[in-house]
Amino acid sequence: MIPFLGVLFDGFAYGMLLFLLSVGLSVTLGMMNFVNLAHCSFAMIGAYVTITATQTLGIPFLATLPLAFLAAAIVSVVLERVLFQRFYRATDLDQCLLTIGIVFVSIAVVAYLYGTTLQSIKVPAYLQGSFNVGGVTMGIYRLFLIAIALDVAVALVVGIEKTRFGARIRAAVDNQRMARGLGIDVDRTFALTFALGSGLAGLGGALAIQMVGLDNDFAFRYLIYVLIVVSVGGLGSIGGSFAAAVLLGVSDVAGKYYAPQFGAFFIYAVMIVLLMWRPQGLFGRR
C-alpha cells in the first residue's frame, strides 16, 4: 500500500507539471481556435531563461519564475502580432505547418546557443530533500510544484469565469463582430490571451527542469504529452485539462513503476480508451 501511495504522489506531481505545460494550449486552442504546435517552444523559452538567469546572472531560482513567464509571454505576443494573427482564419493545416516550423527554428536556435547537452539546475536548499508522511516519501520540490499548479488552476477558473477580462474573452470567441460592436478590442484581447497561455507554458518549462531535465528537443518531446492532455481534457476546458493531466500523470508513472518494460505505452493506452469513450474529451462539448 505504501509504495502505491508513493507512486500516486509522484504521478500527481507529474500530472501537475503536465497541467502547467498544457493548460495554456487548451485555452488558446479551445477559445481562439488556433492550432499552436509551437506551444512547447514557449515552455522551452521559459526554461532556458531560467537556466541563463540562475547560472549566468546569479538570480535566485524563485525570482526567475516570473521572468520565465514574462519572457515566454513577450515572445508570444510578438509572434502573435507578426505571424499568428494572419493565420487565425487559415486552415488547420496551414496553422500546423506554420507553428511546427517555429518548433524547428526554436530547436535550432537553442542548439546553437546552448548546445544539445542535458541541462540541469540547482534549486534552493529549502526546496530540496523530502519527508515522510505515514511512510510515504514526499519530495519538497514536488509539493512546491503541486502548490503552484493548484494556485494557477484556481486563478484561471476565477479569472476566466468571474472577471470582466474573462467575459471579454468569451464574448470575443463567441461572436467577434458583436464583441467589436460592444467596444471590446478583440485583437488586444486575443493577444493578451495568447500571452497568458504562453506565459504559463514558460512557467511550466522553468519548473520542469528539476523534474525532467532540459535539452533542445524539449519542445518536441513534450508536445506529444501536451496534445494528449488537451485532447483528453477537452478543448478550452481548464477543469478538463486538470483532470486529464492528473489521470495521465498517474497512469504514466504507475505504468513505468509496475511494468517498466511496457510503461511508456500506458499513457497512450489510457488516451485511446478515454477518447473512445468520450471523443470530445472529459469536459469537452459535443
Annotate each predicted stretch with a short phrase.
Residues I2-L17, G159-R164, F190-V232, D252-A264:
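Inter-helical junctions in multi-pass inner-membrane proteins, predominant
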Residues L20, A72, Y225-V250, A269-L275:
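Hydrophobic alpha-helical transmembrane segments of polytopic membrane proteins
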Residues L25-A47, F61, R89-Q95, F165-R168, ...:
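Short, non-helical or kinked segments that cap or interrupt transmembrane helices
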Residues G58-V103, V109, A243-L248, R278-P279:
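Alpha-helical transmembrane segments within multi-pass membrane transporters and channels
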Residues R86-F87, T91-K162, T189, A254, ...:
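Transmembrane helix-bundle core of multi-pass membrane transporters
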